[in-house]
C-alpha cells in the first residue's frame, strides 16, 4: 500500500515493468534518453514516473574502433555483463540509446533471451 499525495485513499501500487538502460556508451545519449522519458511521462508526482535502472559504464571499449577493425578490444563482454546486471536489478525491458551499440544487438538478444526487448 502507498499513499499518493492528492489521493483520498491508500492504493495498492500496481506491479510496474522496469526499464533498464544500457548506457554510458556515449553518456550524453543515456542522459538524453532519460531526460526525454522524464519530460514525456504524464506524472503528477515522483511515483508516477517509470521505474528505471541505468548502467553507465563510460569505460566500455570503443564500439566504433572495434566495428571498423581498428581495435581488437571487443566491447560486447562489458555490454553483456551490464545487461545481466540490469536484469539482476529488476529490468524487464532493456533500451540501448547508443547508435553504434546496436551493432551488437543480435548478440545481446541471444545472451539475454528472457527480456521482452533489447
Features from the language model and the residues they span:
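N-terminal glycine-rich anion-binding loop in soluble enzyme alpha/beta folds
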Residues: 2, 10-77
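Short secondary-structure boundary/capping elements
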Residues: 74-78, 96, 100
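Short Gly/Thr/Asp-enriched flexible loops that form oxyanion-binding sites at enzyme active sites
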Residues: 100-114
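Conserved small/polar residues in nucleotide/adenosyl-binding loops
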Residues: 118
Amino acid at each position: 500500500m502507498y499513499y499518493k499525495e492528492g489521493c483520498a485513499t491508500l492504493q495498492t501500487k500496481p506491479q510496474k515493468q522496469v526499464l533498464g538502460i544500457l548506457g554510458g556508451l556515449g553518456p550524453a545519449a543515456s542522459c538524453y534518453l532519460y531526460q526525454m522519458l522524464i519530460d514525456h511521462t504524464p506524472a503528477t508526482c515522483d511515483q508516477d514516473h517509470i521505474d528505471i535502472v541505468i548502467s553507465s559504464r563510460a569505460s566500455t571499449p570503443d564500439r566504433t574502433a572495434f566495428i571498423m577493425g581498428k581495435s581488437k578490444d571487443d566491447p560486447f563482454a562489458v555490454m553483456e555483463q551490464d545487461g545481466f546486471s540490469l536484469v539482476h536489478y529488476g529490468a524487464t525491458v532493456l533500451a540501448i540509446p547508443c547508435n553504434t551499440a546496436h551493432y551488437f544487438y543480435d548478440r545481446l538478444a541471444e545472451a539475454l533471451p528472457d527480456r521482452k526487448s533489447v
